A protein has these predicted regions:
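Walker A (P-loop) phosphate-binding motif
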Residues: 1-25
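PAPS-dependent sulfotransferase catalytic domain
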Residues: 92-209, 219-232
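Active-site catalytic microenvironments for nucleophilic, acid-base chemistry
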Residues: 22-28, 118, 200
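Short, conserved clusters of charged catalytic residues that mark active-site
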Residues: 3-4, 14, 84, 107-110, ...
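A short beta-to-alpha transition loop/helix N-cap that caps and shapes the active-site region
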Residues: 38-44, 135-136, 216-220
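PAPS-dependent sulfation machinery
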Residues: 25, 30-109
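PAPS-dependent sulfotransferases, especially Golgi type II membrane carbohydrate sulfotransferases
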Residues: 1-5, 199, 203-335
Length: 335
């Protein structure tokens, strides 16, 4: 078993689930799917940690249930977050006889520096996709999935991509092991992309990594937005109607021009664009303030899940589910 983890990062709807499924086709790789224990880092702020950390983690995103790990298999005397991550993630990898352990999670998009500090020898794979396509996919997923309907998810995605790129470049300059790929290349030429990844993490290439046939996708959430990765073909859906609101589409284009100018055309990926406006000082300032406020709210939500009595959280979740079901019934009556 390797001493340091492998983390797979990318924005939501950018191909991280596909990449996870292909990576785990390798017999030596055993990544968890959106374990995200680091999101609940507040569990370990108290000296000695919280004894119910595993129960709260499982309540947060059913990570243990999805990976068929019994709650009593999680050690209760863990005092530090890195030790908790090692204990469970390595246990999961050992279950399939793998030596490469870690996690793929889009919710780590602004956690890169923190993960690198916690695991200095960790390796990172970052997948990029055209920001406009990321946001389109988020809006399509929101048609059926309530998580993507949260206010500001496309805004988080657009500016989270930029945050992740800045962190990625800075950490690479510091010598952190980061391998970058693009979604379109993965779909069009999975063999070349997966061979390069194998060279990066120093494992022999396995041809099974180029196909979804026989892939274990049991830990992936249900939902129509995961129908592609749960199918048998690596392909993107073409010729779909536009779903981006005109104003937000124009904003994405302005920022894409700005970021390509700043990177001399190397990032972000996507089709060639015509010359046009870039965002001004007021727009960039207000957008960044909005992004930071949203991420502060996300951090507060995670903090609440770490300390509020679980019974109260269960009652809140049941009430939220009932409200959603009632809203669905009302929507059906209006059709």
């Amino acid at each position: 078993m390797r001493s340091a983890p492998l983390f797979v990062l990318g924005m939501w709807r950018s191909g991280t689930s596909l990449l996870y499924a292909l990576l785990n086709q390798h017999p030596q790789i055993g990544l968890m799917y959106e374990g995200e224990l680091a999101v609940l880092r507040s569990l370990f702020w108290i000296p000695g940690g919280k004894s119910d950390w595993a129960q709260r983690w499982n309540f947060w995103n059913s990570a243990l249930d999805r990976h068929q790990i019994a709650l009593d298999q999680a050690p209760k005397d863990v005092r530090r977050l890195p030790d908790a991550i090692r204990s469970i993630y390595r246990q999961h990898a050992a279950g399939k006889g793998a030596t490469v352990w870690g996690c793929k999670s889009p919710n780590y998009y602004d956690f890169l520096p923190w993960l690198a500090e916690m695991f200095p020898a960790a390796q990172f794979i970052v997948i990029w996709r055209d920001p406009a396509d990321v946001c389109r996919s988020i809006l399509r997923a929101a048609e059926k999935d309530t998580w993507f309907r949260k206010r500001g998810v496309p805004h988080r995605a657009l500016f989270g991509l930029r945050r992740m790129k800045l962190d990625c470049d800075r950490l690479q300059q510091q010598g952190i092991a980061i391998h970058e790929i693009e979604y379109e290349e993965l779909v069009q030429n999975p063999s070349a992309v997966m061979k390069a990844i194998c060279a990066f993490i120093d494992v022999p290439f396995d041809p099974r990594m180029t196909s979804l046939e026989g892939a274990d996708r049991s830990a992936i959430y249900d939902g129509e937005h995961h129908s592609g990765v749960k199918g048998g073909k690596i392909a993107r859906k073409e010729n779909r109607p536009e779903v981006l609101p005109p104003a937000f589409k124009a904003k994405i284009e302005r920022y894409t021009r700005l970021w390509r100018r700043d990177s001399h055309g190397s990032w972000p990926p996507g089709p060639r664009m015509e010359e046009g406006n870039t965002p001004g000082w007021f727009e960039t300032t207000t957008d960044q303030l909005g992004f930071r406020a949203m991420r502060a709210f996300d951090a507060l939500t995670a903090f609440i899940y770490c300390f509020v009595p679980i019974r109260l959280l269960e009652n809140y979740r049941r009430a939220k589910t009932r409200n959603f079901e009632q809203q669905q019934k009302q929507d059906v009556r209006l059709l």
